[in-house]
Each structure stands twice: as C-alpha cells, then as structure tokens.
Amino acid sequence: MPSVRVKENEPFEVAMRRFKRSIEKTGLLTELRAREFYEKPTTERKRKKAAAVKRHYKRLRSQMLPPKLY
C-alpha cells in the first residue's frame, strides 16, 4: 500500500498529488478496477489474446517503412 508522509508546511493538494502519483506507479487503481467484477477465465483469456494481437499489429505497423509520397 503506497503511503505519503505530509511534510512540514506542505499544502494538502501537493501531498494528495504525490499520493495519486504513487498509486498510479504501483498500478493499484487499474488492478482494483479489473477486480471490481468477476471475469470468467475464458473471457479473461479472450481479452488478453485480443490485446496481444493488437500489440503485435501495432509493433508491425511501427516497423513498416512509410510509403513514398512522390
């Protein structure tokens, strides 16, 4: 669990921003949203496979040479 110690004479907003940043770095919020509802194992596998395919095509697209415009 991320924790933030409020420094002396530090505004609350700054401490809150540091806390939000630390939670974002650990990935706690994304995991919480993923675990909010039960996901069947088949659905989870299907979603992960679709994400892998999307990443693969994105990587291929970035490696392709741009078309010549002349």
Curated annotation (Swiss-Prot):
A GO BP annotation: translation
Keyword Ribonucleoprotein: yes
Transmembrane segments: none
Keywords per UniProt: Ribonucleoprotein, Ribosomal protein
GO CC aspect terms: ribonucleoprotein complex; ribosome
GO terms for MF: structural constituent of ribosome
InterPro entries: Ribosomal_bS21 (IPR001911), Ribosomal_bS21_sf (IPR038380)
Cysteine disulfide links: none
Family according to the record: Belongs to the bacterial ribosomal protein bS21 family.
NCBIfam families assigned to the protein according to its UniProt record, in alphabetical order: S21p
Protein name (Swiss-Prot/TrEMBL): Small ribosomal subunit protein bS21
Organism, scientific name: Laribacter hongkongensis (strain HLHK9)
Lineage: Bacteria, Pseudomonadati, Pseudomonadota, Betaproteobacteria, Neisseriales
